[in-house]
């Protein structure tokens, strides 16, 4: 069952060739009244397709198909199109987004429909749909209603918008309509950037002008949008990269490979591209040095270093271990012996251990 309380079940079916498909089957529903501008007071199961379609938000979503000769998995599916509004097909073909009924009424029922409308602007390679003028006006004049909508619902829609093929164009339209002034107050939105396919990267890119540090910025946005800890951490790390000058040296690239997960690498590279950084040299070196001979872990531990140097447990021993790990990675050393030989290269007994750099990037 998926969403059983909403009358939705997952059905597995087989076509004539034995291929298995899954589809969601949802009971017809009808809404009660809307009194809080967030959601219907109650939703009841129904048996009338007309009532179900009448409760939809946009004309392109207010259509259904009545199967005539099977649909799923069939080579020649057939069915009867139900477009009771009468404008769904036309709007779908012309790329127009408009509401079922009066736009003011639909928006007043559920403020989230304002954000949801922007998601439905996306047509992939087909570019953007256009707002019906009535819908555009209704959105701009009802922005304060978003304060009634839960942050979680808004973030769920924004994630999907930031994952769209045309996310930058949609963000521009959201800025023009005043959406971000309500959902991200005090955050300057940058619309002059090249977006990726990663919604967290794209969120970091459009918020790149925020002057506060990564942790402060991500905490602020996390409280406004209810980001998860993982999302907030990634946003913070990316924001800290905004002023980095990529060092394409082999040492830097190896440290990048050793300290970042595959997801982090992908996100950072996408983010730097979005900022317009020159990535060619760095990415070329990364391809050549992505695999380290000994992996990313240290070849020597604190016990061995203590045995060789006579150092007891403490900050000096700990910093020495981390320094050796850094040099191991930067030089791509392959054996314990090679790492131990590094001890002869500098005065680890008397130099200031606070200046010894451990493995990190950048």
Language model regions located:
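Catalytic cores of the polymerase beta-like nucleotidyltransferase superfamily
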Residues: 1-362
